[in-house]
Amino acid sequence: MIRLEAQLPSGVVARFYYDEQGRVIRQEKDTNGNGKIDLWIYYNKEGTVERVEKDVNFDGKPDIWIFYEGGKPKRQEVCSNQDGRIDTWLYFNDKGEIERKEVDTKGDGKPHRWEFHQNHQPLRNEEDTKGGGRVDRITHFQDGKISRIEEDTKGNGKMDTFSYFENGQLVRKEVDRKHNGRIDLWGYYEGAQLIRQEEDLNGDGKPKRVLYFRNGEVVLREEDSRAQGRIDLVEAFSHGQLVKRLMDSKGSGKLDTLYLFKDGSLIREEKDTDGDGYFDLRIFYENEQVVRNEADTNRDRRVDVWAFYKDGKLVRQDEDLNFNGRISARYYFKDGQVIREEKVADEEPWAPSESFSSVQEELNRMMSEVPGSKRAKRIAIKEGP
């Protein structure tokens, strides 16, 4: 073997090794001028490059190995953490473009992430995130940006979580929570924040519960609790606490009962007792006991009956028999029985009472917390008588 050392025009010191036939078989270079070889180039008998080794951290040992076929790079191996073990493998197509990249993310000498490329752009990544020898995460790309991620969270070889992206931003996530091959949870995102979540509660593939979020907190919940294909429960939240609940108490397909809460306790209830779409009974609570009722008995949306309770028992009832907003009769009760009756000459009620609203008006107020663009396609709610 013959060795020839020379300084190239670039100033780099190079050594050339030749066989007896005068063919170059190896080339060594000190590319940074520190007196140590950091680049090795090996040639085959035809004089074409067969392998290149590089010392990129200049510790005197190769960190990158590039293997050639027909003068073109075919495979590259990399030791990226200076432990002497290969942890990255790159494979090239006939054009010299990266076609596949494999990475050892666990330090056991085996690849756990496989990156596939096409036309200089990422096409798909496959990962074994748990190190169990099975791909449990697949990332798909479109135009160089993430378009979809599939995940196997249970480790049974079946993907159960699917995340969808637009322009690199998460917009939807679907989850098979029961691992039976059926999606039962859907999440919708804006600006990387969850704005709506839909749940299938009985396994028929259709959402039965919808949760709406603002700044990471639930503000509204809709539910088809009877699986009848229509919403029968709507709840509003503020700072994580339930403040209103509107529900179909009879299973008739009509929302008819409204509950209002403060600090977790029930303070008021309103009912549509005749199913005409308007509330006509209002019940007030203190310390979870009824203290007062108000009722509309003639459907004019105005209060004409006031009932008062003590220790949860009815003790007095005022009535507007002429429906003119004034009290004309008063009854006193004991143990559920009338014990005294008084005629009253157009007395003012003990306090002003607000008119009864329609069920739809209350629903609209609750839904106003959620912009129309963020709402789910509503499950039918029956309106009117």
Language-model features: locations:
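N-terminal targeting and processing segments
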Residues: 1-51, 70-71, 96, 143-147, ...
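Thr-biased low-complexity repeat/linker tracts and other Thr-enriched repetitive architectures
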Residues: 105, 110-111, 121, 129, ...
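Conserved positions within tandem-repeat grammars
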Residues: 16, 38-41, 63-66, 87-90, ...
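Acidic, divalent-cation-chelating loop motifs in proteins
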Residues: 17, 28-32, 53-57, 66, ...
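Ankyrin-repeat and related helical/solenoid repeat scaffolds used for protein-protein interactions
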Residues: 282-340
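Eukaryotic tandem repeat interaction scaffolds
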Residues: 179, 201-203, 207, 211-214, ...
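Pro/Ala/Gly-rich low-complexity, hydrophilic intrinsically disordered segments
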Residues: 91, 96-99, 116-119, 140-145, ...
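Acidic, glycine-anchored loop motifs typical of Ca2+
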Residues: 10-11, 33-37, 58-62, 82-86, ...
